[in-house]
Design a protein with these regions (language model features):
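N-terminal beta-strand motif that seeds the catalytic metal site of vicinal oxygen chelate
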Residues: 2-28, 105-110, 161-166
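Vicinal oxygen chelate
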Residues: 2-9, 122-166
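Amphipathic alpha-helical segments
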Residues: 25-40
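Conserved short beta-strand elements that form part of the metal-binding/catalytic scaffold
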Residues: 41-102, 154-160
Length: 166
């Protein structure tokens, strides 16, 4: 006879708490994000720098510093990041043929409320000399601007009207 006891529903997931990107020079990248976005780190170490953005967190990890588990008295943070072969390619300044250095080109998006605020950020980024990659107008009325950080990551600033839920 089958059990009639139902499992309770799982608690809902509410948001992504952490977004992490891998950088070649943690100090230079932290300075770029501080000066470009006007955000201050809440945590800094040779391995990771953390920035608070509302209820979410942007983590910058130094390439090669996350390939071992981190053991603490309360648990273990598992290793993550590029495999050793990919890591070696990313840490090499060229591809061996004198071509441009390798990049993960990770992407993440930062939220603002309105298309006008995206335009304000675009002007700010231009004034700072940040490499703008593109602009996008969305069917729902949202707007995005894309720019590149020091490691070639694609950062987006977008307004409401991009997705059905935002």
């Amino acid at each position: 006879m089958a059990s009639t006891t139902a499992n309770p529903p799982l608690p809902p997931l509410t948001h992504i708490l952490e977004t992490c990107i891998y950088v070649r020079d943690i100090a230079a990248s932290a300075k770029f994000y501080q000066e470009t976005l006007g955000i201050a780190p809440f945590f800094e170490s040779p391995r990771v720098t953390g920035f608070s953005l509302g209820v979410t967190t942007l983590l910058l990890f130094e390439l090669g510093q996350t390939n071992s588990d981190v053991h603490t008295p309360t648990g273990t943070i598992p290793h993550h990041g590029p495999s050793p072969r990919v890591l070696a390619s990313l840490q090499d300044k060229t591809d061996g043929h004198g071509e441009e250095e390798q990049s993960l080109k990770q992407h993440f998006c930062l939220a603002v409320q309105s298309p006008e605020q995206v335009e304000q950020w675009e002007g700010h980024l231009q004034a700072k000399g940040v490499k703008l990659l593109s602009r996008m107008g969305w069917e729902r009325g949202g707007k995005s601007v894309y720019f590149e950080d020091l490691d070639g990551h694609v950062v987006e600033i977008a307004s409401r009207g991009v997705w059905p839920h935002y």
